[in-house]
């Protein structure tokens, strides 16, 4: 067993301490939001809630889950993730596979690669983007949230580099055995690229779940808003229509701050539950997809 030098031990100790401090600082806002969401309106208004609930209650969550606007926005986002993520992953694979081939198999590979890279570095601006979507008749439709970003270029580059790292001898042996490129992609490349596939899947999932700007721009009706667009309007709005609630007990335990905190935490919860299971694939896919080529 190799013994670590003093300098190496010092570096690792400093590294762990620094990362622990940064992780703690990142958790503080989330813990504060969670504590506020479980606190009474009186405690939240008095600004005495720090990192532990004061006068614990679940009224904010009960009211948040009963609001049709919140439920509709949640459903739109779930549908967007379930439909948009597979579309992103499938199209990314179909684009990355031919671009990973040699020039003798795909003559215009470098040209198309630069076209994709150019679109990642430069864009036509907000107004041309909006006019294009409007011309396609997608304004105020669900597909406006999915199709404009159906082929994420960064994911294409990541998967492209991963595909190039697969030994060519495997593909050549499969071609000799009579496999088509479709079969090579689905039976050989995809199983070997599981970490990269998991990485781009996580990118797509988080991107769809956290996207808010396109919903505000492309949706005319609030009932078509995805969750993050709804929360964005909620954060800047001071009128949450709480006065529609008749029960005096509920009114005494809910205010704007506790309701916002509960809805923000409910919006972040699915990602927090999903990420730990994909983290190992995420790190491996990022490292291998960035160094191979």
Where on the chain are the PLM-derived regions?
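A hydrophobic, multi-pass inner-membrane permease signature
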Residues: 1-293
